[in-house]
Each structure stands twice: as structure tokens, then as C-alpha cells.
Amino acid sequence: MSNEYDYLFKLLLIGDSSVGKSCLLLRFADDAYIDSYISTIGVDFKIRTIEQDGKTIKLQIWDTAGQERFRTITSSYYRGAHGIIIVYDCTEMESFNNVKQWLSEIDRYANESVCKLLIGNKNDMVESKVVSTETGRALADELGIPFLETSAKDSINVEQAFLTIAGEIKKKMGSQTNANKTSGPGTVQMKGQPIQQNNGGCCGQ
């Protein structure tokens, strides 16, 4: 993989266990789907490079790999994140009700300027759907963040989800860069946050 890129964005996938975070990551990074995806305890991440507006963006996407079941997600997971995707299961109301709890975690640990995206996954399971599109969108509107419904299984809106949050981060960084030009040196850009390339603790597949 080439090391040539204009931006390096750290993205997080958070949400209740079994909402399909690992499946979304696998679909976007490898264009694959495993129905019985089993996460090991740890933190897994995958990398994919995309092109957007003539810029090369390297996305480093982190998955909690089962830690959310034990509430062991720590501040180190959120540190340096540019974007966070909050995922719920369209067929599981409890996972939707817990979204605000995850948002409070973000507020507690993440950078206040972090970009957020709300995703309702498993949208292909129409007959089992209990969280309507309107309900999901209403919450996203209340929070002032983008919203998409996805299906990792049928590859619906998965690509669009990651492109959307990458675009939001790039747009925010552009506005910060302009602010830096007017305010002079000494301001800190999101791009300046170091990201450790640590391949340890990858979840087994």
C-alpha cells in the first residue's frame, strides 16, 4: 500500500454489541460479508484509501471488537479520532435507545470537534424492522448529525456512509485551516494529531 496520501483520518465504529459494526467494517474495507462474524476481545482496525475532491484520504477505521459488552472501552480508544460512526440495529429497539448513552461516552472522551454519523444497520431485514427511517432521521436531526440506513449484508449505503463522514471531516478541517490563516500560528489542527500504527490486538477472522 502506498504511503502517499493527503489526509489520514481515524474513524471509530461504536454502538451496542451485535449491531453489525464488524460487518460494516469488513464490507467497506474488504467488500466481504460473514454472517456469523465472531469478534475477539480487543481492538481491530482496517485501512482503506479513498479519493475525494482530488485528494487522497487514508481511513484508519477502528472497531471495538466486543469490548462494548463489558464496558471496557476507554478514553484511549477515542483519543485522536476525527470521526465517529454510531451504529444501531434497525431490528433492535434497545440498540437505538442506547444511542444517547454512546453519545454521552463521545462527549466524555472524544475531541469536542469530532464529526459524527448515525447509522441504522440491517436495513435489509424489512419484516423485522422496529426502528423506522423517520425515527432514526428525527434523532439525527435533533443531534444535528448526518443519518443513513445501511445493510452490510446487501452492501447498501456502506460505501456512502464512510464517504459521508470523510467528507464531513475534510470540510471541517478546511474551515479550521482557513481559521488558522486568519488567527496566525499557534492554533492546533485536527490533522496534527498523531495516529499510532499499531497492528497488535487485531481481531481474528
From Swiss-Prot:
UniProt keyword annotations, A-Z: Acetylation, ER-Golgi transport, Golgi apparatus, GTP-binding, Lipoprotein, Membrane, Nucleotide-binding, Prenylation, Protein transport, Transport
Lipid attachment in record (S-geranylgeranyl cysteine): C202, C203
GO molecular function: GTP binding; GTP-dependent protein binding; GTPase activity; myosin XI tail binding
Region called Disordered, residue ranges: 174-205
Compositional bias (Polar residues): 174-186, 194-205
SMART domains: ARF, RAB, RAN, RAS, RHO
Motif (Effector region): 37-45
Gene Ontology CC, one term: plasma membrane
PTM-bearing positions, type N-acetylserine: S2
Predominant location category: Golgi
Subunit text: Does not interact with GC5. Interacts with XI-2/MYA2.
NCBIfam families: small_GTP
Residue positions binding GTP: 15-23, 33-40, 63-67, 121-124, 151-153
Domain of life: Eukaryota
Cellular localization per UniProt: Golgi apparatus, trans-Golgi network membrane; Golgi apparatus membrane
GO BP of this protein: endoplasmic reticulum to Golgi vesicle-mediated transport; protein transport
Family (UniProt): Belongs to the small GTPase superfamily. Rab family.
Record membrane topology: Lipid-anchor
Protein name: Ras-related protein RABD1
Biological role stated in the UniProt entry: Protein transport. Regulator of membrane traffic from the Golgi apparatus towards the endoplasmic reticulum (ER).
Source organism per UniProt: Arabidopsis thaliana
